[in-house]
Amino acid sequence: MRILVVDNYDSFVFNLVQYLGQLGIEAEVWRNDDHRLSDEAAVAGQFDGVLLSPGPGTPERAGASVSIVHACAAAHTPLLGVCLGHQAIGVAFGATVDRAPELLHGKTSSVFHTNVGVLQGLPDPFTATRYHSLTILPKSLPAVLRVTARTSSGVIMAVQHTGLPIHGVQFHPESILTEGGHRILANWLTCCGWTQDDTLVRRLENEVLTAISPHFPTSTASAGEATGRTSA
């Protein structure tokens, strides 16, 4: 299986790559201005799935990101957008991305979802780590994108295309404080043709819980996560 991660110059993109590797996937990583992305249609045709990473700035300034969304849509290639990549999906289909009601950098929120797509099998709500100042504006969302997760205040946390294998999450599944990060990626990989190993996914989830529990008890985990992330 060939999976491409488009790196939007995010400081923690290799956490995503590591999670994929733990699921048995050796992803290729190309920067968003890599010359190989100039033929987006060819790229969409040669990979089983494309992941658009988080990163700083706006979708329009994230190299080939928006063009890759169009190419994957045309080829029906499974696509997952994370944070900035999620916003690129919105822009590609006509939504407006603008300032979020609150600026969050390394803070956790409860996310309420519809238990479909990449979020299937997660607790409702689940805890997710957020690093963003921009968001897809709900009133601008086109009919082809449906909201699959929100915060309690209504900020869009995930979208899914109504007819294509295209998914976006505003939060960061690769953060150690996000519940079910491996499961989210595993759910997406099944769209790409991967046979899900639920025993493996549960083991990885338990390893994350074991690693953080001595340092981030439930009462303090929501206080946030201090990192040097550069995401928008």
From Swiss-Prot:
Annotated binding of L-glutamine, by residue: G55, P56, G57, Q87, S133, L134
Keywords for the protein's UniProt record, in alphabetical order: Amino-acid biosynthesis, Aromatic amino acid biosynthesis, Glutamine amidotransferase, Lyase, Tryptophan biosynthesis
Leader peptide range in chain numbering: none
Gene Ontology BP terms: L-tryptophan biosynthetic process
Organism domain of life: Bacteria
UniProt keyword annotation of Lyase present: yes
Keyword hit for Amino-acid biosynthesis: yes
Pathway: Amino-acid biosynthesis; L-tryptophan biosynthesis; L-tryptophan from chorismate: step 1/5
EC number: 4.1.3.27
Assigned GO CC terms: plasma membrane
Reaction equations catalysed: chorismate + L-glutamine = anthranilate + pyruvate + L-glutamate + H(+)
Active site, renumbered: C83 (nucleophile), H172 (for gatase activity), E174 (for gatase activity)
Domain Glutamine amidotransferase type-1, residue spans: 2-198
One Gene Ontology term of the molecular function aspect: anthranilate synthase activity
Pfam families reported in the protein's UniProt record: GATase
Note: Was identified as a high-confidence drug target.
Record text on subunit structure and interactions: Heterotetramer consisting of two non-identical subunits: a beta subunit (TrpG) and a large alpha subunit (TrpE).
Role, per record: Part of a heterotetrameric complex that catalyzes the two-step biosynthesis of anthranilate, an intermediate in the biosynthesis of L-tryptophan. In the first step, the glutamine-binding beta subunit (TrpG) of anthranilate synthase (AS) provides the glutamine amidotransferase activity which generates ammonia as a substrate that, along with chorismate, is used in the second step, catalyzed by the large alpha subunit of AS (TrpE) to produce anthranilate. In the absence of TrpG, TrpE can synthesize anthranilate directly from chorismate and high concentrations of ammonia.
Protein name: Anthranilate synthase component 2
Originating organism: Mycobacterium tuberculosis (strain ATCC 25618 / H37Rv)
